[in-house]
């Protein structure tokens, strides 16, 4: 994600420098290295105009879920940024999130890999 966000300060602070100066720490916490252990269903929400987290990051996570058979859903907003702010989109966001939580958190819900 480094280099594809406008918020480099956060990444450099959390990882104590750039990936060029502290590669080991970046590799230690790379989601890609943990993806093979994912079992929890995930709802990924992304927007085209999000300059904080690049859209490709969400696609990579969703692709990993699909390849491993972990339940996942990708909700995409072509006209939003890092926050979903438009009223119509917020209603959709809330509906999808609440349906997702109901599907996986209600008593007797299916969890883990299908």
Model region roles, listed by residue range:
Residues 1-114:
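Active-site-proximal cap/loop segments of hydrolase catalytic domains
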């Amino acid at each position: 994600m480094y280099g594809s966000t406008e918020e480099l300060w956060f990444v450099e602070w959390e990882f104590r420098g750039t990936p060029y100066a502290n590669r080991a720490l970046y590799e230690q916490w790379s989601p890609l290295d943990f993806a093979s252990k994912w079992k929890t269903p995930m709802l990924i929400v992304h927007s085209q105009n999000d300059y904080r987290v690049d859209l490709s990051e969400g696609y990579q996570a969703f692709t990993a879920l699909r390849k491993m058979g972990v339940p996942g859903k990708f909700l995409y907003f072509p006209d939003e940024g890092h926050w979903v702010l438009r009223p119509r989109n917020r209603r959709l966001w809330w509906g999808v999130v609440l349906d997702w939580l109901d599907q996986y958190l209600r008593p007797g819900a299916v969890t883990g890999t299908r």
